Amino acid sequence: MDTSVNVDTSSRPAHEPATAPGRFVVRDACHEDLPEAAAVQAVCVREIGQGVIPNDVLTEVTGPGIVHTTIEQWNHFMDDGAIFKILVDRLDMRTVGVAMARVSTSSDAPTPWEIATLHVLPEARNCGASDNLLDACIGNRSAYVWVFADNARAISFYQRHGFHFDTADGAVDDSLGGVELQRLIREDIIESQ
């Protein structure tokens, strides 16, 4: 399996701005979508990890080997009932975002559902597409998500969707070179499913 999926992050044509109605659509992901979705995640992690994750670790955790491992892991999660959604740019039918939620396996989970990933390429940000992706993935479910403690953009995004900081201490992700994480929680939502 070729895991060296390239994702073009160049600017889109001026005649079709990100805010054009219907430019970005959310759909259920299938197994065949996972390589491109994992590549999107790698691009986004490289972006948010700059200056936060040590360079050698960042190169390792966003390289082809990890992308391949992510694809394998996501295939298992999908088979086990995880919810996968992708965001597609209708200009060229590329995947520009991915979201995955699953029933948490953590013993200290504050809610049944965990948002395990939500990443959107820069050209699809700030136009409502990320909001649509999150809504399609978890709807009104109570959920939690771990974010980099200093990722103000992600924290603001989740707070706009009713998430708040967990009162428990954050965590440190040693696999990312000791990055500090913060958990955000959305509770007391009427479950839609």
Where are these predicted regions, by residue range?
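Conserved active-site alpha-helix within GNAT-family acetyltransferase domains
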Residues: 131, 150-178
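Conserved G/P- and acidic residue-centered "switch" motifs that form tight phosphate/ATP-binding loops
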Residues: 128
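Terminal substrate-recognition subdomain of acyl/acetyltransferases
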Residues: 2-19, 177-193
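Conserved GNAT acetyl-CoA-binding A-motif
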Residues: 139-150
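Short hydrophobic clusters on alpha-helical segments that form packing/core surfaces
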Residues: 136-137, 154
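Acetyl-CoA-dependent GNAT
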Residues: 6-7, 12-13, 24, 28-34, ...
